[in-house]
């Protein structure tokens, strides 16, 4: 029995060691900045489609600025501004160690909103990967309207910034879709990063 137990312990130990070797290593840059870039690029494409839709249907595109998914929800303008807040702003918060709410004083027309989002995308693309990864294991303190909430950098991104980012991206997409703009899931997903050949990768969206 002792021999069997030793053998079982050895098998379990080896299995655990193999599992460690298979553990995927995902950096802060990969899980945040690369995701921000992919989704913001996709939303910019949706906004471009919104512009074309308005032109083709003689609609003032600035009417979309105040469009809402539901009367109780905030408009497209807020969704885009907040998208920047929880992406580029999240990186800035990790650097400074503090985060608040989005800037509610910003005002843009449709063109200005596109430019604002495109400029943020450009700045995200210019970030240094090593410098972003070096922000790990820090602290970010949320301070807003009397609420103070401390996070580790990891928890700030995983449980707060990223969920909020995807929520506002989804609402922005849904506002455009519900307003008649011909966008679908492939437009929302955007350009995926794959090891497939360019020819195969180009066919991906027909399955989404």
Protein language model features and the residues they cover:
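Short, Lys/Arg-enriched N-terminal segments with co-localized hydrophobic residues
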Residues: 5-23
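Alpha-helical scaffold segments that form or flank carboxylate-/histidine-based iron centers
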Residues: 25-38, 60-85, 103-113, 148-164, ...
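Structural signal for well-ordered, non-membrane alpha-helices
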Residues: 40, 44-51, 88-91, 118-125, ...
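Acidic interhelical loop/turn segments
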Residues: 54-65, 126-157, 189
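Conserved alpha-helical segments that form or flank metal/cofactor-binding pockets of metalloenzymes
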Residues: 72-100, 120-127
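Mid-length scaffold segments of soluble, non-membrane domains
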Residues: 112, 116-119, 128
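C-terminal or internal capping secondary-structure element at the end of a domain, subdomain, or sheet
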Residues: 154, 161-204
């Amino acid at each position: 029995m002792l021999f069997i137990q030793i053998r079982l312990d050895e098998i379990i130990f080896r299995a655990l060691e193999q599992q460690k070797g298979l553990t995927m290593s995902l950096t802060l840059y990969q899980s945040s900045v690369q995701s921000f870039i992919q989704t913001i690029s996709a939303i910019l494409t949706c906004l471009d489609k919104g512009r074309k839709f308005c032109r083709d249907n003689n609609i003032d595109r600035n009417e979309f600025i105040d469009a809402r998914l539901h009367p109780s929800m905030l408009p497209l303008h807020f969704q885009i501004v907040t998208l920047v807040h929880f992406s580029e702003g999240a990186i800035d918060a990790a650097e400074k160690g503090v985060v608040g709410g989005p800037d509610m004083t910003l005002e843009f027309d449709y063109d200005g909103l596109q430019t604002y989002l495109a400029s943020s995308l450009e700045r995200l693309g210019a970030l240094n990967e090593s410098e972003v990864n070096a922000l790990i294991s820090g602290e970010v303190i949320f301070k807003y309207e009397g609420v103070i909430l401390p996070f580790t950098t990891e928890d700030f991104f995983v449980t707060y910034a990223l969920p909020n980012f995807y929520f506002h991206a989804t609402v922005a997409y849904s506002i455009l879709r519900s307003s008649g703009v011909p966008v679908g899931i492939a437009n929302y997903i955007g350009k995926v990063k794959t090891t497939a050949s360019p020819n195969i990768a180009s066919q991906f969206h027909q399955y989404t």
